[in-house]
Amino acid sequence: MIRISSRRMCRLILSIVSFLMFGVHAAQASETNIRVTDLAERTVILSHPAKRIILGESRYLFALSILNPDHPLDNIVGMLADLQSIDPGTYQQYQQRFPEIDDIPRVGHTSADSFSVEKVLSLNADLAIFGVEGHGPGARNAQLIDQLERAGVTVLFIDFRNDPLVNTVKSMRLLGHVLGQNTRADAFVEYYQAQLDRVVKPLAIAMAKHPQHSPAVFLHSRVGLQDLCCETMARGMMAAFLDNVGGQNIAKERVPGSAGILNLEYLLTEQPDIYIATAIGAAQNLEADAANQPPYIVLGAGVSRSDAQASFQRAIKESALGSLTAVRNGHAYAIWHHFYNTPLNIAAVQVFAKWLYPQTFADLDPHATLETLYQRFQPVPLNGTYWVELDTKAGRS
């Protein structure tokens, strides 16, 4: 019979208890891990909600603001400079309410090539939020992703660009999980889906009762960016909005990828029923020397309707697109380009629905939808013009 002293027995018991407690804590830690599948179909695991975040595109501030509208910048330790460069109107709104936005380190400019892994690693980040595709690092940047994850920076992929009307909801739920903001994410998703239903359901009913002609649409992307006529979107981005509302995108059969060029001769031959331009100009363009500015259409934060209309008139005049039947017949419109890369895209979908089927959607009010999105889910007020119809009478005066 083996005898164990009381002192050794106490030590043994303490050791066993410590071992068991370690096992309990390990199990609890495992159970509390955040585990999701991102939109690049990768398993992403965090031990706790992210506290030090890198934004692969600073335009994702729209999404993060939905989850934390009072303090959207609190956990951002670095970001690309695209918002300030590409959408200065919105950046200025954030700057006015949150001056500290200027102090957030920039980890690149407006491209994946400019993204600095070294800078990110110096910021002790625990999560990097990237788009599957876009201006920042994407799912194809395998070496960069590997570098970050080897250094302890978890990478999460979201998407508002490739398949926006499917992946906006998925992306917001993912962000809600990894940031510990599920309640806010669920509230947004509920509103988003309700507003999408206001397009999808009436359109399905109308088509079933009275099959309608599907309008042929030319989507003219980033008007004024280059002299060559005319850049367009064929798949994903705003082309997905057209698909959702039953528009016939004339670029689909001619452009093999997501975006490309349709020349003016083709447009004059095809003569689309509707012309929609995307506007990359901002209020800041109006402050510069207008004579030396490209013919951008100006929309977005801080832009008046009259300035938007004047810029649209100029763009049409300088591009020779005034000869399109859609323009002459009063079916020419422009919309804020950056809807394609934010969860606020549902307002643009509703706008497209009204432009294509004005009778079916006579009671739909996209501006009210956008107002609600800003009031409930954004930290800055809705202040600007985000879409406009070309005033053909003004063009003839």
Where are these regions (language model features)?
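A general, composition-driven signal for non-globular sequence regions
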Residues: 1-5, 19-22, 266
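Bacterial N-terminal signal peptides that target proteins for export
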Residues: 2-14
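Bacterial N-terminal signal peptides
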Residues: 11-23
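N-terminal ligand-binding lobe of clamshell/alpha-beta domains
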Residues: 27-397
